[in-house]
Amino acid sequence: YVGMYGEQDADLTYRLWQTLKQKINEEEVGEIYKLESSLIRVLIEMRRRGVRVDLDRAEQVGKELKNKEDKLLSQIKNWYGITPDLWAAASVAQVFDRAGLEYPRSPKLNAPSFTSAWLESHDHKLPLAIAQARKFNKARTTFIDKMILDHEVDGRVHGELHPLRSDEGGTVTGRFSCSNPNLQQVPARDPEIGSLIRSLFIPEEDCHWGCFDYSQQEPRLTVHYSLLTKQEGAQEAAEAYTDDADFHQIVADMANISRKEAKNINLGLSYGMGKDKLIRQLGISEEEGQILFDQYHERVPFIRGLRDTCARLGSNRGFIKTILGRKCRFNLYEPMSYRDTPYPYEKAVETYGKGVKRAFTYKAMNRLIQGSAADMTKKAMLDLHNEGILAHTQVHDELNISVKDKQECEKVIEVMRDCVKINVPNKVDAEIGKSWGEIENYKEYFK
């Protein structure tokens, strides 16, 4: 008899809620709790509906990719008499040895190592052929076979969206992760493979595929918070921030440096990257790097100002609060004067003595901006659902949605743009097409 057991479940849940409700009020996280709770029904609907896929085309593309891979492997065999196992470094090394080509080795084991970056940057035909064959193999096995054909049910793929769980800190910032399959991993950057795989995802019947992307979402939030905290130079950046403004170009113009340098520094600082690592990434000398950094911080002081303000708040209060009230906490401690393994306070004191400080507060600005971006995207999804519009997928600052016409497309843009108010113009870019991989500016498409 399970009646009493079921009653206990209900009673314990109710009593637990009475305690947690009080805790939510004490912590002043009611608004974000309401958002996350309301979002559950949206995510259930998204998973239940799934995303339509073109199965016939998926199988056809899979065969085409297999033919391209086989052709490259056949060429390699004709050149050197060996057909390598593409993902086995020892096997690839045999072909390189036959070709008389040197290759990198891993520092610890001194084993052959063939990264994509190294293969693609080589000017010899063999590494380029290996890189291409690997690309075709991965596109077929990872994205067509495993992501689509192994997961489709009645022509649809039903991925799981996790609003507060991720291998990369979803519980810290509130960003979504996805699994079974991970539709956030559908390739985008590769001009050949990206559009090919994305073209297999198609809209609902009698609809168009819409890709709605927040334009420079995190940089806009950076300027917003710099204004709120009255950072020096923030007003100048805000005044330059029109609808079509490019944050990295604004900073480049302010600092009198190239856009590439500005972008690398902007992103590096927002992620809490140290100066030495940034200098290595820019590929410049230490002396050149110091001059560049001095110039950057002198002319664009609001970035460092906001970073320091966030780190101080995280250290003093133990948390940073995002735009809709999410608390990103800093509950681990490390030694005051050097870096070591961080622990909860009592264990840290037991291990290192009383001279401890909160760990990871240098990441406070990143958590504020990423967390606020997650808040904005989630609020947009909820507001759209309230308008009867349900997203197919969410990929960081992008929502993919089936739209009936130009009017509905512009409704999505308006809802996403206005769901959270910030102190600089917000912008949503929209591209429309007959599939995810065949999209263009919506104004051109609906001409």
Regions found by a protein language model. Name each.
Residues 1-193, 202, 206-208, 215-218, ...:
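Conserved "right-hand" nucleotidyltransferase catalytic core of DNA-directed polymerases
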Residues 48, 101-104, 124, 253-390, ...:
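Conserved catalytic core of nucleic-acid polymerases
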Residues 421-433:
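Conserved short beta-strand edge segments in small beta-sheet-based binding/regulatory domains
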Residues 281, 400-404:
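Short hydrophobic/aromatic beta-strand micro-patches
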Residues 22, 35-42, 358, 378, ...:
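Catalytic phosphate/metal-binding cores of nucleic-acid and nucleotide-processing enzymes, i.e., regions
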